[in-house]
Amino acid sequence: DEADMTSLKDDLKNYVDTLENDIKGRKLFYIKEVCDKELYKDSNDEVLMKVLDDFYKTLDKLREEGFIIEEISIDKNLLEAIYPSYMSISCAEATSNNANLTGIQFGPRPEGVDSYQELMMKARTEGFSELIKRRFILGSFILQKENQEKLFLNACRVRRLIVDKINDLFKTYDGMILPASGGIAPKFSDDSEKLSDRYLIL
């Protein structure tokens, strides 16, 4: 669609055919501060220990196939800044990019409203999940004039430091390998609704 800046015209490629079979000597790295079992020795999380055991077994198999795998260290402060930076930027962008979700052009159209302000409020109240509402509230807070420098712009600066560090590592290594998750999906009964656990970490 020539009128849609998000569409892309590209010939279909078979990316599997472009893979090189010769993997010997390819260099991968993993991050000590994420994978070192010693860091979790005081934890009673058996699932996490099993994940890490399986991860190190996978590394051994990859080494047998010819990969060179090295452990590298990254400043813990930088690693701990990844999630709050992501939340700050993504919530701010979600709030800004979805400002057009008013219930006027598209979306749920509530009945019995007397003004477009009431229409927007009802459409967003009824049409958004609790998670989306939380993200929009955080995004609005982050984008307030008095918070932009402290929260949003600082998060962008931290993102730049993270990207620069990873790009620098990729000058030496062909790829990064890490466990996909520190555990398994929680049961509904185990899920915590404490917002401070996930959101109020800025």
Across the structure, where does each feature detected by a protein language model lie?
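A short helix-breaking turn/cap at a secondary-structure junction
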Residues: D1-L52, Q117-K122
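Glycine-rich, small-residue loops and helix-cap segments
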Residues: C35, V51-K61, E65-S73, E80-Y83, ...
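Flexible, acidic loop-helix segments that line cofactor/substrate-binding pockets
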Residues: D4-L12, R26, K32, I72-M87, ...
